[in-house]
Structures are given as structure tokens and as C-alpha cells.
Amino acid sequence: MERTEVPTSQPAEDDLGTADGFSRWVRPHWPAMVRLAARYSADADDILQDALVAAWRKRAQFDPARGTARTWLLAITADQRSKAWRRAARTLSRPWADPEAGQTAGEAAREATSVVPPELRLDLRRAIGRLPAKQALAIDLHYYLGLGISDVAAVMRCPEGTVKSHLSRARDRLRTQLGDDYR
């Protein structure tokens, strides 16, 4: 999978304090935030709004020495997605497992050029939706958003070895769920 390079330059500290500066800072990372929020969630707009509000409120806490703007913003988006899942789980039975919910145009385009045959994509999306939340997040970040292991670790706030374990366990579960069609 091709990795997309994202600008890593950071705005001046005082520039983050303005709405325009903050907007310019978020803009290059927005498509990845949208894709992450939209995976298996019909509440993507709410998740994104909550993520932006949280990022705005916490902007003074951003430390470029601890990670990139991309990983920081994706971590906030992942947190908001998890909160939305927990809220939904209290009232419904795993609504994010609906493979048709929240598909973005970019995701549809990726699926059109995917190496997974069309008749198996829906099964794969459903199977990923049944994974434990951390395993599904690791799969989404690494395989769908194209983040490297170190960036996934930064987003998930865990060691790289833990990310590798989540990915390995997720692949094992997916193989078990999907059978020989995906080998």
C-alpha cells in the first residue's frame, strides 16, 4: 500500500491561537480524520465536530517533540470515535458494525481499486466491524489510512509492539472469520 506524505511543518505557536491558523494547521490532516471517523460509524459528522472542539481546546497541549500534528489529531479523532461507540453500545447493539454506514467517496474509490474481489469486500468490512475496538482501530489506521507502525502507536498511545500484537491478532481473527476465501 502506498504511503501518503503529509506536510509536517507546524504553524507558529501564536498562529494556533487563531481560528484561521488552527484551520490551516488541521486542513492537511482533515481527509484522514474524516476517513477514520467514517469507518463503521454513521455518526461521523458528530465525531468530527467533537474531535475539532477537543483539538481546539487542547491545542496548547500539542507538543511536536512527542509526535506529528497528524498523529495528534488522529488520536483525538480515535478517542471521539471510541466515545461515540461506547454511547451507541449503551443504547444499541454495535451499530458501527454496519458495513454500509459512513462510507466516504474516498473509501468507495479505494474499494474500486482494491485487491479484494468485490464479492468479498462486504464480508471483510463486516468481519472488521466484529473485531475488538483496539484491533479494528489498528487495522483502520494501518491498512485503510496507510499509517506506519510508529504512527499507529502514536495515535493509539501504546508501544509499537502492542500495535503489532493488535494487528497480528486482528489478522488471525479475520482469517478465522473469513475462512479460505481470503488466504
Where in this protein do the model-derived segments appear?
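Short, basic/polar amphipathic helix motif occurring as a linker/hinge flanking DNA-binding modules
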Residues: 84-119
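Arg/Lys-rich amphipathic alpha helix in sigma70-family domain 2
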Residues: 57, 61, 75-96, 169
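DNA-recognition helix of helix-turn-helix
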Residues: 78, 82, 156-180
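Sigma70-family region 2
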Residues: 15, 52-69, 87-89
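Structural recognition of an alpha-helix C-terminal capping motif at a helix-to-coil junction
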Residues: 46-53, 67-79
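A short pre-motif secondary-structure segment
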Residues: 138-142
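A short, charge-rich alpha-helical start-of-domain segment used by transcription regulators
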Residues: 3, 9-35, 42-45, 56
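C-terminal flanking helix
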Residues: 30, 34, 52, 132, ...
